[in-house]
Amino acid sequence: MEENIFINASFIPSENLVALIKSLKKNQAVFLEDEPIAFFTTEGQEVDFDTYEVTEYTHDDVLRIEHTWDIFAKNHEAIQRDFHLVTQGRTSQPIPETAVAFNKENIFIEEGAKLPLCSLNATEGPIYIGKDAEIMEGSAIRGPFALCESATVKMNAKIYTGCTIGPHSKVGGELNNSVLMGYSNKGHDGFLGNAVIGEWCNLGADTNNSNLKNNYAEVRLWDYETQGFARTGLQFCGLMMGDHSKCGINTMFNTGTVVGVSANIFGSGFPRNFIPSFSWGGSGGMTTYKTNKAFEVAKIVMARRGIEFTEADAAILEHVFEETAQWRRG
């Protein structure tokens, strides 16, 4: 490491921020108030910001992910920014004649996308349809919305504002202000709202999450940093699910539920609102989901998509298993 620019990953890049970071020279840093955004350092240099030439970031376009719930809460704005960056200077594929579209100039369709007999309403925000993505007939979508490459919206889906569907993922039923990462499936009826779903997850048919408490109170969410339930400041907050987790048919998740990595949830009733990584069970209790069994499933799931489960993948998940052991009971 002779020279490096370190970047605070919680800041979502904007054109102004990227330009400023690219202009950094040795011993220079960019701060937002007391928080470092980026700094240029060398191998022999200690990270002592008193010795740095500090530039204060003064633009009003800061978008920062400070908590897990920010991923969905700030997704409306993130989609609008990305839409501008991805589409500027480019021409969309034509909107099919069989599709009903509102505010067409706010809709961008990549090559190979299929969207017959669907409704696209970009009045409240842009709609982006990725390469080789498909929106099946009868689906109704409101922007801001992003459907990434080779992702699928199943027939008669209802998708409200602020949703992003990651590459190669499949969604159906009803979604509102939710983010699914790549290669995850919510392919059937059921409601997912104010939620974040990691990669390689699968939600069984008629899985539902609550995103509003019956008493309309502020939602508290498990926080790994404090090892307790944090105040979100939100009235609407649904499900946070880590990579490789699965749930069976008719699973019900309570308001503000956090599911860790590689958990397997099934059965009737509401499971607890914090399910540690590598948990196996449901409302009746949890046992430990052994890594050898979890890895067998991951290999099968990933192979179906033509992707190898590598030694690096296994090492990462083993590390997560060890780090989260303190929260598992069985």
Language model segments and positions:
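Conserved beta-strand and immediately adjacent loop positions that scaffold enzyme active sites
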Residues: 3, 117, 262
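Terminal amphipathic alpha-helical/low-complexity segments used for targeting or macromolecular assembly
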Residues: 1-105, 112, 271, 277-330
